[in-house]
């Protein structure tokens, strides 16, 4: 008898287009019963711009709406939202905003047993779709199992209004799939770790798709952002299929997490991932110059100075990256890089 299995939870509804925020009520009602209570989790800036539009659309569909404003993405905040959802018997928790709001809503909905709806206002990373959440307060800065969204509602017009830097960070996060899949294959060969070809191919397709449209994305056109968003959704779905973050997160993400620990000035997640991908592509013997060229095309950082971090911080991050998730085998090996090897890698690739 074949006993190996894993569960795949996928979104029921994915909508990407112009003006869809004002139609969100119809999409949310498709995954919730009429009269359901929808708790919108959002930050102060985003909620002041978009909450009233979202509420009007939800209430037009007979849904009751509440707002929970958060200021950080910590376990404590997420647990607070979960308690409120449980005590008030809230059926739907919607994340409106960037990574913080979506990660908190995602985690809280799992804890409360509520339906989760993802409504991103920036295209900064693929967490808009994935069933994993990144929160501060755990022992290590890694993604934890949460809940896949039942519905994803992405208004391209809203995304286009976001600071360009955040959307370009999403490009960096997607470029990281090139090395993430290489690391996954390596772990399969050397550690007999489960490897799913379909999930890996889907993640790679996301990276290849935005690579082909790099110039359009650089221009910040609606079409360019639509391609970026669809690729982020696709990458998130690859994690749903794999049942882990493996197809989307490898050594380049370990570097990014490590850099966030050691750097005084914190770059955006996708920015750090992009720079990490340059170096990890070199270690894999791949065309790291092409990776750097793609990042330059869209205006993403390619070195420490552009990231706003110190050279020594990059080197230190490289030396501790393998210890962020010791159970996750990557090109960095079990013990990671020595300081000498880390500095040589960063210099060879022009990161420092």
Swiss-Prot record:
The keyword Manganese does not apply. SUPFAM superfamilies: Dehydroquinate synthase-like (SSF56796). It is found in: Cytoplasm. Its cofactor is Zn(2+). Substrate binds at residues 126, 173, 257. Keywords: Cytoplasm, Lipid biosynthesis, Lipid metabolism, Metal-binding, NAD, NADP, Oxidoreductase, Phospholipid biosynthesis, Phospholipid metabolism, Zinc. GO terms for molecular function: glycerol-1-phosphate dehydrogenase (NAD+) activity; glycerol-1-phosphate dehydrogenase (NADP+) activity; metal ion binding. Its EC number is 1.1.1.261. Binds 1 zinc ion per subunit. Pathway: Membrane lipid metabolism; glycerophospholipid metabolism. Transmembrane segments: none annotated. Zn(2+) binds at residues 173, 253, 269. It catalyses: sn-glycerol 1-phosphate + NAD(+) = dihydroxyacetone phosphate + NADH + H(+); sn-glycerol 1-phosphate + NADP(+) = dihydroxyacetone phosphate + NADPH + H(+). HAMAP family: G1P_dehydrogenase_A (MF_00497_A). Catalyzes the NAD(P)H-dependent reduction of dihydroxyacetonephosphate (DHAP or glycerone phosphate) to glycerol 1-phosphate (G1P). The G1P thus generated is used as the glycerophosphate backbone of phospholipids in the cellular membranes of Archaea. Is also able to catalyze the reverse reaction, i.e. the NAD(+)-dependent oxidation of G1P but not of G3P. Is not active toward glycerol, dihydroxyacetone, glyceraldehyde phosphate, and glycerol-2-phosphate. This is Glycerol-1-phosphate dehydrogenase [NAD(P)+]. It comes from Aeropyrum pernix (strain ATCC 700893 / DSM 11879 / JCM 9820 / NBRC 100138 / K1).
